């Protein structure tokens, strides 16, 4: 899986919008009935791009068109700064898989893994996953359907996709883009 291109200008810390997809129905009594659809939020990451040079914008445009084909193929977006994250989704148990990818690069080896919200011991693999992502390995595979999450300190590297449509504007041989690009988090 590809990694979002490294730009010559470091972008400021992206804005993250979380969506829980809660269905809210007004009852006849005036009360609300609320149903949570997702177990974890789906996030939209807004990457700021003001003042980028032509080479950076062309790199993003080529990545969007040639590598990702719009929204078709997912990729990883790596935050520039290391931060602490709590109970990030890592996958679902299937009774056979012992190794799970942590949505992080350069995490400290001090991680806490959870299976259905119960702390479970693992071994840590720094950069041993695909695309240099960190991994954790359980002594025995989590049960089928169990939710695997992880708390860590590192550079959050979620799997994302582009929206299917981006607006570009040609201005005297310079490519300019709207002030930001929205990247939509994806889970397999």
Predicted regions and their residues:
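Secondary-structure transition/turn motif
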Residues: 50-51, 105-106, 137-144, 186-187
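A generic structural signal for beta-strand entry/edge sites
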Residues: 44, 97-99, 131-135
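Beta-strand-rich interaction surfaces with strong enrichment in secreted/lumenal proteins
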Residues: 34-35, 89, 138-140
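Intrinsically disordered, low-complexity peptide-like regions
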Residues: 24, 104, 129-132
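Solvent-exposed edge beta-strands and adjacent loop segments
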Residues: 1-64, 155-176
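Extended beta-strand solenoid/passenger and fiber regions
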Residues: 60-126, 153-188
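Polar, enzyme-active/binding microenvironments
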Residues: 4-5, 10-11, 15, 110-151
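Residue-level recognition of well-ordered beta-strand positions that form the cores
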Residues: 48-50, 151, 182
């Amino acid at each position: 899986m590809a990694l979002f291109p490294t730009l010559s200008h470091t972008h400021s810390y992206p804005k993250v919008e979380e969506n829980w997809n809660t269905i809210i129905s007004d009852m006849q009594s005036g009360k609300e009935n609320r149903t949570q659809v997702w177990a974890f939020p789906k996030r939209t990451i807004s990457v700021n791009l003001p003042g980028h040079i032509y080479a950076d914008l062309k790199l993003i445009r080529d990545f969007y068109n040639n590598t990702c084909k719009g929204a078709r193929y997912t990729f990883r977006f790596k935050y520039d700064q290391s931060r602490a994250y709590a109970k990030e989704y890592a996958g679902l148990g299937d009774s056979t898989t012992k190794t799970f990818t942590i949505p992080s690069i350069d995490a400290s080896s001090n991680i806490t893994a959870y299976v259905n919200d119960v702390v479970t011991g693992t071994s840590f693999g720094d950069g041993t996953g695909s695309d240099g992502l960190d991994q954790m390995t359980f002594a025995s595979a989590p049960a089928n359907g169990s939710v695997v999450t992880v708390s860590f300190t590192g550079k959050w590297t979620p799997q994302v996709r582009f929206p299917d449509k981006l607006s570009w504007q040609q201005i005297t041989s310079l490519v300019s883009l709207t002030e930001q690009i929205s990247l939509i988090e994806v889970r397999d």
